[in-house]
Curated annotation (Swiss-Prot):
Mitochondrial intermembrane side: 22-42, 103-124, 184-213
Protein name as annotated: Cytochrome c oxidase subunit 1
Family membership noted in the UniProt record: Belongs to the heme-copper respiratory oxidase family.
Protein's UniProt keywords contain Lyase: no
Primary location: mitochondrion
Binding sites annotated in the UniProt record for Ca(2+): 20, 25
Cofactor names: heme; Cu cation
Organism: Loligo forbesii
Organism phylogeny: Eukaryota, Metazoa, Spiralia, Lophotrochozoa, Mollusca
Any one GO CC term of the record: mitochondrial inner membrane
UniProt-listed InterPro entries: Cyt_c_oxase-like_su1_dom, Cyt_c_oxase-like_su1_sf, Cyt_C_Oxase_1
Residues passing through the membrane, by range: 1-21, 43-63, 82-102, 125-145, 163-183
GO MF annotation: an example: cytochrome-c oxidase activity
Gene of this entry: COI
Keywords: Calcium, Copper, Electron transport, Heme, Iron, Membrane, Metal-binding, Mitochondrion, Mitochondrion inner membrane, Respiratory chain, Translocase, Transmembrane, Transmembrane helix, Transport
């Protein structure tokens, strides 16, 4: 139900984006609002529709079935990772409602390093929302990798697994490799905005200055 609701919200945001792109200025007539819609649409469709429905629901049912396993390796972890998503969505909605919203188009952190253009708690709420959604995804990925590595019935070697199981396995590994990079970047952004660090160029533009001495 949560995934279906998120899908409907994401679809309505898609329609708004398509309408605005078809005839600019006809619907929203505000660049910042349009960017907020694009950003929210991306997050909602990925973290709150695709992850709970296609991976959390469908994958959790089909992968053990294809492995001959009675269940996932950590059934309770699925539950825990799902219940991180509603508060994450709440934070994302709160970020869009506070001030002018975190509108950055498809990317998240580069344009946000400047406190001048995005002052206030809106971006910080979006960052915390991403942290929760990322933790949820990482828990799910660990569960899938552990299940596929350890829960196959005897005789089902890795090369005999179905392509669907392989695709979930590789996707989970790539997720574990990529999400900490995003987490590090948005955490650096969070400290830049609130603790006076300078991981990103303080004059704006989003250029990292980590290795410049």
């Amino acid at each position: 139900i949560f995934g279906i609701w998120a899908g409907l919200v994401g679809t309505s945001l898609s329609l708004m984006i398509r309408t605005e792109l078809g005839k600019p200025g006809s619907l929203l007539n505000d660049d910042q609002l349009y960017n907020v819609v694009v950003t929210a649409h991306g997050f909602i469709m990925i973290f709150f529709m695709v992850m709970p429905i296609m991976i959390g629901g469908f994958g959790n049912w089909l992968v053990p079935l294809m492995l001959g396993a009675p269940d996932m390796a950590f059934p309770r972890m699925n539950n825990m990772s799902f219940w991180l998503l509603p508060p994450s969505l709440t934070l994302l909605l709160a970020s869009s409602a506070v001030e002018s919203g975190a509108g950055t188009g498809w990317t998240v952190y580069p344009p946000l390093s400047s406190n001048l253009s995005h002052a206030g708690p809106s971006v910080d709420l979006a960052i915390f929302s991403l942290h929760l959604a990322g933790i949820s995804s990482i828990l799910g990925a660990i569960n899938f990798i552990t299940t596929i590595m350890n829960m196959r019935w005897e005789g089902l070697l890795m090369e005999r697994m179905s392509l669907f199981v392989w695709s979930v396995f590789i996707t989970a590994i790539l997720l574990l490799l990529s999400l900490p990079v995003l987490a590090g970047a948005i955490t650096m952004l969070l400290t830049d905005r609130n603790f006076n660090t300078t991981f990103f160029d303080p004059s704006g533009g989003g250029d990292p200055i980590l290795y410049q001495h």
